[in-house]
Amino acid sequence: VYKMVTAIAAVDMGGFDPGYIIEDKGLYTFYESFQPKCHIWSLANPRTHGKIDLMEAIAYSCNYYFYEVGRLTYDSYKKETGNNPFDIVAKSLGLGEPTGIELPEDTGARANAEEKNKQYAGEDAGWFGADVLQAVIGQSLNKFTPLQLACYASALANKGTRYEATLLSRVVSWDYQDLIKESKPVVASTLEISEKALAALDQGMRMTASIGTAEQYLRDYPIPIACKTGTAQWQGTTSTGSFSGSDHASFVLYAPADNPEIAISVYVERGSQGGNLANVCIPILDAYFSSSAKYETVATENIAY
C-alpha cells in the first residue's frame, strides 16, 4: 500500500512522467550484492509484468517498476536537496505520525537513515541502496498501524489533505436537546500533489479494483472504488515453535472513487496477500452505501430510571 508514496515522489520530485515505460525483468540486478525480485517472479516460474507504465505498476503492484523509479528518484533528489523524498511524502500523508485519535497510540516508524541508526549499531546502521529498494515498496523498517493506513487512504482521497482522526462526533445532553460539544474537522497536514500525480494515482487505484490485484472481488462492484493491495513480508516461528513464512496482508480503499465518502483499511496478520482482503471490505461498503438512515441518537440499554 506504500507504493502510492513512491508514485507521488517519482512524479513530483523525480520528474517521472506517469506514462514512462519500464520492462519488468523479474529479478532486479542493479546491485550485485542485493537483487530483489518482483512478487510474481521465481526461478521455478519466471513470470513478469512485461512493459508497463506507472498506472499499471500500481494496479498490478509491480515491485520491479518501483525499484527502478524509486532508486532513480531517491538518488537524484537526495543529490539535489540532501533529503529523502519518500520520507517527506510519507510523513505528510500520516505514515509513522500521530493520527490525533483520543487514545494512546503507537506511531510506528518510517524507513529512513535516521530510523535505521536508532535500531542498529556499527556498520549495520548504514543506509544503503538495498535499504532504499526495500523502503520504496513499503518494506524495510516501515511500520504503520491500520488507523494510520486509513488516514493515509483518506488523505489520498482528499488530494493530499490529511485530517486528524477522531472517535467522537458530538456530545449531547441526556435528552438530546442540548449540544455540549461537537468535533470539527482538524487539518493535520497538507501535501501539495500535482494534477499529473493525482490523475495517475486515481487511474492506477481504480485499475487495481477493475483489472489488478483486487479485481477478483471488486471488478463488478456497482460503485467505483480506488484501492491498493499490500503484502508485508514476514517469516518466523509460530507460538508452537513451528516455522511459518506466511506474509501479512494489508488493503486500503476509498469510495466512491470520483467523489469519496469513506476510507477503509484492513490488515490481517499472516493473511498472505492483500488482494484477499478486498472481500472483507464488501460487507462494509454494502452497509455504508445501502443505509439511508442517519443515526442521530444512540440506543439505550435496558436501564430503569
Describe these PLM feature segments.
Residues 149, 273-282:
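Short, charged, low-complexity patches
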Residues 178-188, 278-305:
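Short, gly/Ser/Thr-rich active-site loops of penicillin-recognizing serine hydrolases
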Residues 1, 5-269, 305:
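Beta-lactam-recognizing serine transpeptidase/beta-lactamase-like catalytic domain environment
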